[in-house]
Design a protein with these regions (language model features):
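Class I SAM-dependent methyltransferase Rossmann-like catalytic core
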Residues: 2-55
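Conserved class I S-adenosyl-L-methionine
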Residues: 58-69
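Class I SAM-dependent methyltransferase SAM/SAH-binding core
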Residues: 71-116
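A conserved beta-strand element that flanks and buttresses the S-adenosyl-L-methionine
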Residues: 131
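A short, conserved alpha-helix within the catalytic core of class I
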Residues: 138-151
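Conserved catalytic/acceptor-binding region of the Class I
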Residues: 156-218
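C-terminal helical/coil "lid" or tail adjacent to the Rossmann-like core of SAM-dependent
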Residues: 214-265
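Early extracytoplasmic/lumenal segment of secretory-pathway proteins
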Residues: 290-323
């Protein structure tokens, strides 16, 4: 598993390559499903309505899944879309995908996210959807820019899921929570990655490209004893990344983990890890646009943290899209 504990991504070149542990992907599956309940309630109805009313999908919907990993995103999304589907897993190193049985309607393409534009230029965009899960925050800003540009240029709807936001709350509270989290988030930004700002950057870029964008908060909400094994693994991975980023935190991290492990054993530890999904549509119903505008203005009003590590093109798009 990658030191940042963020399985699911396959990137195109060093130093941004992420190694994925299938065990980690399996461990997080239950947390992902629970977290996406808000997407089921808010974003999926809008997506389905758009595909039926605006795109008039009546044949096969082709779904391109970026960084597909084990195919968990397809397993989750496919039964929730009332269309005949053909899936394309676009993965630079699809070792995991090829090692697992796949539905007959699934194609695996060994290529990087930068090839999305070329892939979308082929065939009918009216019958396509781009999606990914747990990917955007481990892309470099250049790769994120390429994904958004491909979606905009080809006017394809997109559903991007489970991107980390950098937020985390742990109960009981400890004074070392924040410095350890700050170091972890800085580690997420290493080597030019978009990190915790990825989902905000993507939303801004897509709005600047004329898309209507809605979001749903999809945090992991974990507690002992039911999630103890996963929480212990998650915290250890995050601490490892924090110490790599700031070796001076080594002693603090070790003591902090021992404290949290004891609280897990006592059944008193709770943790929430921020994630967000976005649905981006090239046009849409007026009701969807109104909801999206209300959400966007609320996000702009409450956003207090600066954006880090953005590519110049995306920075310009953000400036152009703000009211």
């Amino acid at each position: 598993m990658a030191a940042d504990g963020r399985g699911g991504a396959r990137l195109s070149e060093s130093p941004a390559v992420v190694n994925v542990d299938p065990g980690w992907l399996a461990a997080r599956a239950a947390a992902d499903t629970s977290a996406r309940a808000s997407t089921v309630e808010t974003l999926l109805p809008d997506l389905i309505n758009y595909l039926i009313e605006i795109r008039a999908v009546d044949g096969i919907l082709e779904i391109i899944d970026l960084g597909a990993g084990t195919g968990a995103n397809q397993k989750w999304l496919a039964p929730r879309l009332p269309f005949q589907q053909r899936w394309i897993h676009l993965d630079h190193d699809p070792v995991i995908s090829r090692s697992l049985p796949q539905p007959s309607d699934t194609m695996i393409i060994d290529s990087s996210v930068e090839s999305l534009g070329r892939l979308l230029a082929e065939g009918s965009v009216d019958q396509r959807l781009v999606t990914c899960s747990a990917l955007l925050d481990v892309l470099t800003t250049a790769q994120l820019d390429a994904v958004c540009e491909a979606v905009i240029d080809n006017q394809v709807p997109a559903l991007f899921s489970l991107s980390v936001t950098g937020a985390q709350s742990v109960s009981p509270v400890d004074p070392h929570d924040q410095p350890l989290l700050d170091a972890f988030n800085d580690h997420q930004r290493r080597a030019g990655r978009a990190g915790p700002e990825a989902i905000t950057l993507a939303g801004a870029a897509l709005r600047a490209g004329g898309f209507t964008v809605r979001s749903a908060e999809t945090p992991w909400q974990l507690s002992a004893p039911g999630d103890s094994a996963f929480v212990a693994q998650l915290l250890q991975e995050r601490l490892d990344a924090a110490v790599v980023q700031d070796p001076g935190l080594s002693v603090i991290a070790k003591a902090w983990f021992e404290l949290r492990r004891a609280q897990l054993e006592l059944g008193v530890l709770q943790i929430e890890v921020g994630h967000r999904d976005i649905l981006a549509l090239p046009g849409g119903t007026s009701a969807f646009a109104e909801r999206a505008e209300v959400e966007h203005r609320a996000d702009v009003t409450t956003q207090a943290e600066p954006l880090y590590g953005a590519g110049q093109r995306i920075r310009e798009q953000i400036g152009a899209s703000e009211p």
